């Protein structure tokens, strides 16, 4: 059967690709049917035949036959794909008469198909694709080769309503392509040219829209016109909006007609988003007229929440569009409305609508409303941050001396506070949740949407609390009373209330916070005693833990409370309900980090520091915890011990702290001394892994002083490492590499890995490089290097490489002498694991380049000391790195190369021979990634490296001839070298293009941003021919812009008390 299939496929392919005979349209239809309805081999054959045909340079000459005679819609779509391909990729090289022919054909086809209203409805998708083809042609042709396009399309529109409706769609698509999606698709110059052309000729388009809106009775046409207008509103000259009848037409004629109300409201929202000062009167009119219409369509006493839940799609969309309109208008022009006394009432009505819409049970709508409430609260706070009502204990009356704008919004903001408290989203720290079935369970998947919503709500509530925290406190206290007396008791109500209480940490005066929290915690502890049932207790426990974790300032100031809370957490550590123990450990570690000093001091009324009590009872506290919870617990206690400044006391604490794990460790080591086979026992190996994990977490928290514990187990630990390595190698030799997947072998590897993590973790926190280099490094190298080299690739631990990188980064010059030994053991054998492809051994890959980077940055002389053959391998591996598809590896590779070039330039003796051997090679490889689409994210780094290299040449830093065979001036040689390189890679480029590009590489190499733009425009030119998507060329800018926005936002947040979660605040600002 497959043989027959192949013959048929060959026959079909031969016949379809034979351009000397007429196209067999039935055969093509059959092949397309096979693709869509066939299976397996048949489908694959069809795919191959169609791909071959599509890639044929003359395929486009068959498109007219396909579109005219095929009865199969999918075949027609296939024909259009061929056409789109030729327009995007080969238009520039087609003879003019052929371009004109295609253009005429497409226009004729669109007119024919869209002039018939029944056809328009029936063949909607087909016409949509034809329209897109025309827009692709326009991007190539208009305005230069088709200056009359706008007047052509406007003129044709007046001949038939159904043609006009489709032309509106074409204009909408053109607007989107030019104004919304042009960045990176076309060169900057061309994009500007198209935008200018469109603005200059807009009056004809606008007259057409106006004509339709005023005269047409054809509802679908009017709708299409409004949709098109909507796309224009963000770029057209403002006179068309504010100096015509457009606004009143939209409001009076279309807003109250159900079919048009959504698109009209969207248009009004787009207009409301314009921020200019010279049209205040028009904005007032827009607002008052829209509000009048709104009150007729949706009276102020409507229960919008109910209306939304019972509404049809169209009605629900209207409420969402209404929220967007109000949010946009009030954000942009709210202050204008405040200033006009005659508009106060309308402003209050708009706010009333916002409150009603905010109650709708639909997260997307709530997010829109939240954006406005956040904006309003932040603006009112920033206007006068220090006029927050003074402490009510000090001021007899509640609202004295309130700024007038706050006074205006007083009652609205109180309702918004209630709304935020009742709807607060779940914070990240809360692990105990109610699922869809109404069961209380532990949450395993973090919901990022919900976390972001929480952050925005939290920020809004913090601002609202600053504006009037007496009101906030009254609302929260009242709701808490209703939980205790049972009138509002439910898991959901308790949760949202407690999440809201936790979210305003830092926003009250300390005295008020204390009074408020004492009430809250007492009430919640009482509720915990009062309620029966495990689920109830779990929910209340999770809320107590969340709140206490959010108020470290309060806990630091009130020792008795801190102690009560920590003892309560120890109680919860025995509570086996899903998620409660996890949350208890997480909250304990947070409190330990923020209040660490308080646990190592003797507090008033205590006989010893609390840390001693914890260590005395450690066994009882952790007896019901799972291993990973024990590790978290140990890290938490480690932070406390790290805060003890007396070295002798601290060493004594560490000994006591590590007593339990050390007892088990000593017993295993003793047994192993008598019989080494104990290290093949699964239970024993598992225990060793867990003990080492405890040490790793403890070391992370204690830091350098952990040396006393590390020294105690160090040599035994390295012996265990060697012994387990031999066991693993023996098992692989006996049973092959598959054995590495077995549980016992995996446990053994865990012990090796945790050993390396412990050592690297301590080294990175140590503060005496010489002591580390002399005492800890030699036995480590002895245990791990030869073992790594001898192991089969699958059994090599990537942590060996990361540990070496950490040691080099930390010890710098102290370790230079050991680099050759390290390199001998790990370099070549790892390179052979990763240079076959870009995928295998991802961790070794990343760590290998981190090690190279460390040596390059801190021990560069060691590079110059290794033999030339090995140095060539180093360079090859750097080139291999920056060609990687794994972005982190490619970035590291570029970083290493740039540092290497800068380091080499400092070494007079080595530099010239390096340039002679490698300079042109490096240049060639960098150009190969610059022009590769999968590497556009590295454009800034590519630009920096190339600019640096061209600068070296231009400034004569390279004295040795780069072309020994024909020693001309290096600058001229490199100009020719690069030009030839590019011409052979991209033969379609004109000589003038290449020359201009190469000249720019020299003239712009002092200005990195300009150099990068120069590269980017060149890439657009290459891609336009190749017909590739160019949107990714701006990937890096988008990332940078986002990062900068994030940093700006963080700075702003730091300045408002309570905006940052207490655990995001740097340590020195807290304790």
Swiss-Prot record:
Q: Where are the HEAT repeats?
A: 217-240, 241-277, 354-472, 515-553, 560-597, 602-639, 775-813, 885-916, 917-954, 1002-1039
As stated in the Swiss-Prot or TrEMBL entry, residues carrying the post-translational modification Phosphotyrosine are: 454
Q: Name one GO cellular component term.
A: nucleus
> Per its UniProt entry, which superkingdom is the organism in?
Eukaryota
Q: Which residues does the record list as Phosphothreonine (modified residue)? A: 448
Q: Where in the cell is it found?
A: Cytoplasm; Nucleus, Nucleoplasm; Nucleus, Cajal body; Nucleus, Nucleolus
Modification N6-acetyllysine occurs at: 446, 693
Q: Which GO terms describe its molecular function?
A: DNA-binding transcription factor binding; nuclear export signal receptor activity; protein domain specific binding; RNA binding; small GTPase binding
Query: What the protein does?
Result: Mediates the nuclear export of cellular proteins (cargos) bearing a leucine-rich nuclear export signal (NES) and of RNAs. In the nucleus, in association with RANBP3, binds cooperatively to the NES on its target protein and to the GTPase Ran in its active GTP-bound form. Docking of this complex to the nuclear pore complex (NPC) is mediated through binding to nucleoporins. Upon transit of a nuclear export complex into the cytoplasm, disassembling of the complex and hydrolysis of Ran-GTP to Ran-GDP (induced by RANBP1 and RANGAP1, respectively) cause release of the cargo from the export receptor.
This protein is called Exportin-1
Q: Which organism is it from?
A: Mus musculus
């Amino acid at each position: 059967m497959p043989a027959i299939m192949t013959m048929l496929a060959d026959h079909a392919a031969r016949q379809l690709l034979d351009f000397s005979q007429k196209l067999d349209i039935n055969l093509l239809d059959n092949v397309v049917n096979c693709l869509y309805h066939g299976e397996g081999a048949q489908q694959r054959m069809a795919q191959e035949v169609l791909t071959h045909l599509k890639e044929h340079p003359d395929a486009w000459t068959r498109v007219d036959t396909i579109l005219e005679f095929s009865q199969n819609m999918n075949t027609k779509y296939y024909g259009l794909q061929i056409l789109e391909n030729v327009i995007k990729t080969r238009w520039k090289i087609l003879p003019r008469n052929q371009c004109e022919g295609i253009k005429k054909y497409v226009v004729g086809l669109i007119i024919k198909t869209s002039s018939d209203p029944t056809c328009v409805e029936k063949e909607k998708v087909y016409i949509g694709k034809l329209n897109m083809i025309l827009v692709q042609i326009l991007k190539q042709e208009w305005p230069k080769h088709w200056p009359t396009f706008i007047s052509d399309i406007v003129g044709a529109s007046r001949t038939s309503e159904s043609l006009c409706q489709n032309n509106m769609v074409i204009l909408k698509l053109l607007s989107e392509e030019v104004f919304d999606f042009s960045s990176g698709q076309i060169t900057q110059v061309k994009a500007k040219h198209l935008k200018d052309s469109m603005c200059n000729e807009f009056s004809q388009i606008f007259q057409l829209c106006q004509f339709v809106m005023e005269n047409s009775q054809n509802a679908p046409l009017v709708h299409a016109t409004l949709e098109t207008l909507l796309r224009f509103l963000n770029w057209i000259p403002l006179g068309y909006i504010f100096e015509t009848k457009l606004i009143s037409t939209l409001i009076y004629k279309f807003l109250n007609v159900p079919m048009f109300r959504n698109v009209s409201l969207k248009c009004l929202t787009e207009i409301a988003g314009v921020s200019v000062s010279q049209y205040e009167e028009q904005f007032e009119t827009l607002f008052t007229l829209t509000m009048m219409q709104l009150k007729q369509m949706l009276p102020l006493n409507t229960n919008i929440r109910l209306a939304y839940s019972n509404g049809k799609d169209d009605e629900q969309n209207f409420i969402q569009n209404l929220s967007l309109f109000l949010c946009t208008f009030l954000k942009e022009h709210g202050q204008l409305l405040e200033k006009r006394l005659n508009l106060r009432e309308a402003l209050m009505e708009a706010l009333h609508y916002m409150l009603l819409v905010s109650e709708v049970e639909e997260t997307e709508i709530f997010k829109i409303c939240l954006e406005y409430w956040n904006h309003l609260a932040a603006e009112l706070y920033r206007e006068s941050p220090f006029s927050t009502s003074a402490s009510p204990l000090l001021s007899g009356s509640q609202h004295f001396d309130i700024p007038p704008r706050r006074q205006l919004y007083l009652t609205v903001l109180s309702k918004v506070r209630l709304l935020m408290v009742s709807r607060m989203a779940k914070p990240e720290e809360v692990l105990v949740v109610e699922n869809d079935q109404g069961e209380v369970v532990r949450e395993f998947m973090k919901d990022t949407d919900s976390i972001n919503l929480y952050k925005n709500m939290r920020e809004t509530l913090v601002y609202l609390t600053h504006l009037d925290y007496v009101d906030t406190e009254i609302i929260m206290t009242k709701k808490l009373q209703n939980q205790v007396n049972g009138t509002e008791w439910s898991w959901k109500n308790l949760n949202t209330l407690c999440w809201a209480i936790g979210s305003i940490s830092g926003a009250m005066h300390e005295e008020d916070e204390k009074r408020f929290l004492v009430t809250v915690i007492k009430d919640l502890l009482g509720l915990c005693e009062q309620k029966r049932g495990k689920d109830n207790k779990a929910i209340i426990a999770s809320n107590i833990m969340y709140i206490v974790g959010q108020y470290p300032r309060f806990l630091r100031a009130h020792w008795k409370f801190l102690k009560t809370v920590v003892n309560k957490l120890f109680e919860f550590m025995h509570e086996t309900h899903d998620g409660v123990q996890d949350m208890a450990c997480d909250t304990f570690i947070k409190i330990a980090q923020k209040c660490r000093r308080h646990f190592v001091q003797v507090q008033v009324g205590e006989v010893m520091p609390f840390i001693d009590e914890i260590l005395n009872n450690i066994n009882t506290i952790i007896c019901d915890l799972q291993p990973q919870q024990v590790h978290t617990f140990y890290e938490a206690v480690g932070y406390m011990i790290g805060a003890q400044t007396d070295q002798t006391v601290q060493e004594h604490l560490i000994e006591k702290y590590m007593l339990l794990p050390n007892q088990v460790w000593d017993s295993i080591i003793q047994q192993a001394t008598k019989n080494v086979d104990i290290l093949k026992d699964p239970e024993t190996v598992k225990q060793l892994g867990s003990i080492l994990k405890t040490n790793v977490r403890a070391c992370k928290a204690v830091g350098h002083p952990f040396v006393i514990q590390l020294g105690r187990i160090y040599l035994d630990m390295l012996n265990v490492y060697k012994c387990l390595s031999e066991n693993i190698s023996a098992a692989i030799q006996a049973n092959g590499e598959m054995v590495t997947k077995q549980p016992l072998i995996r446990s053994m590897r865990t012990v090796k890995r945790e050993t390396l993590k412990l050592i690297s973790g301590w080294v990175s926190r140590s503060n005496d490089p010489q002591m580390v280099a002399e005492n800890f490094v030699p036995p480590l190298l002895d245990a791990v290097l030869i073992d790594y080299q001898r192991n089969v690739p699958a059994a090599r631990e990537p942590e060996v490489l990361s540990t070496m990188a950490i040691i080099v980064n930390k010890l710098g010059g102290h370790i230079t002498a050991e680099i050759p030994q390290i390199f001998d053991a790990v370099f070549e054998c790892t390179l052979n694991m990763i240079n076959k492809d870009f995928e295998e051994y991802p961790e070794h890959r990343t760590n290998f380049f981190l090690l190279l980077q460390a040596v390059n940055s801190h021990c560069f002389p060691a590079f110059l000391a290794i033999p030339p053959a090995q140095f060539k391998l180093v360079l090859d591996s750097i080139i291999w790195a920056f060609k990687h598809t794994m972005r982190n590896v490619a970035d590291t590779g570029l970083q290493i190369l740039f540092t290497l070039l800068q380091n080499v330039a400092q070494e007079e003796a080595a530099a010239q021979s390096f340039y002679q051997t490698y300079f042109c090679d490096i240049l060639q490889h960098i150009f190969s990634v610059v022009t590769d689409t999968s590497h556009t994210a590295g454009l800034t780094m590519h630009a920096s490296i190339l600019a640096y290299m061209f600068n070296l040449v231009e400034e004569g830093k390279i004295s040795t001839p780069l072309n020994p065979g024909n020693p001309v001036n290096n600058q001229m040689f490199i100009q020719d070298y690069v030009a030839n390189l590019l011409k052979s890679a991209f033969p379609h480029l004109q000589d003038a293009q290449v020359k201009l590009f190469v000249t720019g590489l020299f003239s712009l190499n002092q200005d990195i941003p300009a150099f990068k733009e120069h590269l980017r425009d060149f890439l657009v030119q290459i891609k336009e021919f190749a017909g590739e998507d160019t949107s990714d060329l701006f990937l890096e800018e988008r990332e940078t812009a986002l990062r900068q926005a994030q940093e700006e936002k963080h700075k702003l947040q730091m300045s408002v008390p309570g905006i940052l979660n207490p655990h995001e605040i740097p340590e020195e600002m807290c304790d």
